[in-house]
Amino acid sequence: MTSALRLAGTLIPAMAFLSCVRPESWEPCVEVVPNITYQCMELNFYKIPDNIPFSTKNLDLSFNPLRHLGSYSFLRFPELQVLDLSRCEIQTIEDGAYQSLSHLSTLILTGNPIQSLALGAFSGLSSLQKLVAVETNLASLENFPIGHLKTLKELNVAHNLIQSFKLPEYFSNLTNLEHLDLSSNKIQNIYCKDLQVLHQMPLPNLSLDLSLNPINFIQPGAFKEIRLHKLTLRSNFDDLNVMKTCIQGLAGLEVHRLVLGEFRNERNLEEFDKSALEGLCNLTIEEFRLTYLDYYLDNIIDLFNCLANASSFSLVSVNIKRVEDFSYNFRWQHLELVNCKFEQFPTLELESLKRLTFTANKGGNAFSEVDLPSLEFLDLSRNGLSFKGCCSQSDFGTTSLKYLDLSFNDVITMGSNFLGLEQLEHLDFQHSNLKQMSQFSVFLSLRNLIYLDISHTHTTVAFNGIFDGLLSLKVLKMAGNSFQENFLPDIFTDLKNLTFLDLSQCQLEQLSPTAFDTLNKLQVLNMSHNNFFSLDVFPYKCLPSLQVLDYSLNHIMTSKNQEPQHFPSSLAFLNLTQNDFACTCEHQSFLQWIKDQRQLLVEAERMECATPSDKQGMPVLSVNITCQMNKTIIGVSVFSVLVVSVVAVLVYKFYFHLMLLAGCIKYGRGENIYDAFVIYSSQDEDWVRNELVKNLEEGVPPFQLCLHYRDFIPGVAIAANIIHEGFHKSRKVIVVVSQHFIQSRWCIFEYEIAQTWQFLSSRAGIIFIVLQKVEKTLLRQQVELYRLLSRNTYLEWEDSVLGQHIFWRRLRKALLDGRSWNPEEQ
């Protein structure tokens, strides 16, 4: 009970203390850059936190219920440069709220329902360049106390309640102002007096955005003799007549860039006619843009005759029913046609045009030749265009072209190697369908080309000279293509200045060891999304400048032959993530290298084992492989291997002896067919036939002999016949010894088998017949035979009649030994 009371006595004061502590004193802000940038977004702060370093330069306090900013609210942050107070429910800003922020350049007050703004609210902001006061309930610029902000360059007061366009007198102090955004306010009328300050203090660099204001009237002369850098009027007019009248009210304006039209999701005009733009002839315009008009314009050329002297002309999301030739009458240097609809590709003949952007348009899918002698920049991407013979000077009518983008189009047939376009520096074909790329050296004349992208162009590289001539190329992107037999050959021979190479998604499985030998300046190489099963280091040893190598999303299990340490010393980033690493003892050295090179590898923690199954999904860095076996297991394994080896050797050496043993077991004491199996040399066959066979088989009693030339079964191995037909079916064995016998391997083999047969069979007997005198030196070569003849009796063949009589009598007696007697044989 006492301990419980003590615990309660401790917890109650602690809880009371915590309830009094403000969240800002213990909720941590996110430290983006130590001591520099802090994000304190949505932390429910009611006041400026005091636990942020004095050195902070960027502070985000958005979405906190601060509600009230008193004087010197940010005294603790004298180094502050960017302050975001978006949607902090601020209603009151007192004098000197930002005092001491002399280095602040950007202040964002978006979405605060300000009701009380003191005259000195922005005092002390001597370096402020950007002020964003969007959605702050601002009703008039007249009462906005910013006249002293002489360094201000950008003022954004969009989405407020401003009804009058009158620019206050203090604008004459804002001599550095470059951008004024008044879009989405309530301005309906513009009078001459509203712009009086711009007559007194011209701001020729000012960009003015009046979009999404419901303008009904612009007093003629209001903009007369006023110079602006940019004027934007989009989705301002409810009908065509108002638009026509207001554009006429702009008469006398000198503007560098004029933007007219609507927004994609803010359409006010129900109809459109080219007459609405006739008032443009009374303006001096350097660059003109017309955006988002869904209505088909018929014959727009005469519409823009008054813009013939402009330097830039742009149409975005405009439907054009019919267009006559863009002829030499126009002095445009830049023509932009984006996301428009054409019935056919326009005919372009513009002598002064240097830049043409014709992208994401619909209709007119077949490219037609143009005549643009001064053209340097050409973007024809995302149009679905088809080219029957690309590319040469005759296609574009220029020899000055430096930039050509034909990406995201249809079929482009390569019919020329860019004759007349030798000045090209940038060439992009990505995601177009290129034909005839590997039939000749397409880029041979492009010695000045720096950038080439042929990614995903259905190209199959079958010609090693495909990149010949690209001596200045620095960037080559060819992802998503293929190579013959999925093998990368030596195709980069001329690319000695290449620094970036992308070979991802090319289905590569192998590469030539010398594929990169000439790329001494290569810094970035992307080999990801291919089908490599091992990391071959050798091809990269010749890349002294290589810094980044990406081998992610392959099927790499281990390194190939070479040690991974042989990568160039310049390599700083190696990406091997999402591969099929084999975490087994076989690849232990490679896995250890991965752990040792953790600082070199990109996202090494994402490298996971694919095999074996029990380690699948485990991080390679943390996997632990035990590759040491138990000593007992090793000993037993070695002993087993030795035993098996010895048995195998013995079986091999005594195979036929074992066959004989198996036969003895199988046939047992079965009846013999032959009285004797004769072993002799083929060179003694005459004696065997004329003497031995004749006297024994035709004599009394007759004996049945087994002779190989007569009794062996055809189609059966000789050794099998010797064992099965000779030994197993005979009572005795007659060995005819001669010099030829001793020198014959087969005879010696049969004799050795006969010895085994005699040992295994108790009834067996070997009868030796010495056919002729054998030299002892020759006989001693067969040790066992020599010993047997020395210790046992044998028969000798003699030429005398008496000797032969005795020979046959002794031989018959030996053969009759063990034979059952049959009286019918006499």
Curated annotation (Swiss-Prot):
Entry PTM: Phosphorylated on tyrosine residues by LYN after binding lipopolysaccharide. Ubiquitinated by RNF128 via 'Lys-28'-linked polyubiquitin chains, leading to proteasomal degradation.
Extracellular side: 24-631
LRR repeats: 55-76, 79-100, 103-124, 127-148, 151-172, 176-197, 205-225, 227-247, 374-394, 400-422, 423-444, 448-456, 472-495, 497-518, 521-542, 545-566
Assembly with partners or alone: Belongs to the lipopolysaccharide (LPS) receptor, a multi-protein complex containing at least CD14, LY96 and TLR4. Binding to bacterial LPS leads to homodimerization. Interacts with LY96 via the extracellular domain. Interacts with MYD88 and TIRAP via their respective TIR domains. Interacts with TICAM2. Interacts with NOX4. Interacts with CNPY3 and HSP90B1; this interaction is required for proper folding in the endoplasmic reticulum. Interacts with MAP3K21; this interaction leads to negative regulation of TLR4 signaling.
Positions annotated as glycosylated: 35, 173, 205, 282, 309, 497, 526, 575, 624, 630
Family: Belongs to the Toll-like receptor family.
Cytoplasmic side: 653-826
Domain LRRCT: 579-629
UniProt-listed Gene3D superfamilies: Ribonuclease Inhibitor (3.80.10.10), Toll/interleukin-1 receptor homology (TIR) domain (3.40.50.10140)
PANTHER family listed in its UniProt record: TOLL-LIKE RECEPTOR, TOLL-LIKE RECEPTOR 4
Role description: Transmembrane receptor that functions as a pattern recognition receptor recognizing pathogen- and damage-associated molecular patterns (PAMPs and DAMPs) to induce innate immune responses via downstream signaling pathways. At the plasma membrane, cooperates with LY96 to mediate the innate immune response to bacterial lipopolysaccharide (LPS). Also involved in LPS-independent inflammatory responses triggered by free fatty acids, such as palmitate, and Ni(2+). Mechanistically, acts via MYD88, TIRAP and TRAF6, leading to NF-kappa-B activation, cytokine secretion and the inflammatory response.
Protein's UniProt keywords contain Transmembrane: yes
One term under GO cellular component: lipopolysaccharide receptor complex
BP GO annotations: defense response to Gram-negative bacterium; detection of lipopolysaccharide; inflammatory response; innate immune response; macrophage activation; MyD88-dependent toll-like receptor signaling pathway; positive regulation of interleukin-1 beta production; positive regulation of NLRP3 inflammasome complex assembly
Keyword Ion transport tagged: no
Lineage summary: Eukaryota, Metazoa, Chordata, Craniata, Vertebrata
The name this protein goes by in its record: Toll-like receptor 4
Superkingdom per UniProt: Eukaryota
Organism: Papio anubis
Main localization of the protein described in the UniProt heading: membrane
GO molecular function: lipopolysaccharide binding; lipopolysaccharide immune receptor activity; NAD+ nucleosidase activity, cyclic ADP-ribose generating; transmembrane signaling receptor activity
TM region positions: 632-652
Topology of this chain in the membrane: Single-pass type I membrane protein
Key words, A-Z: Cell membrane, Cell projection, Disulfide bond, Endosome, Glycoprotein, Immunity, Inflammatory response, Innate immunity, Leucine-rich repeat, Membrane, NAD, Receptor, Repeat, Signal, Transmembrane, Transmembrane helix, Ubl conjugation
Cysteines paired by S-S bonds: 29-40, 281-306, 390-391, 583-609, 585-627
Signal peptide: 1-23
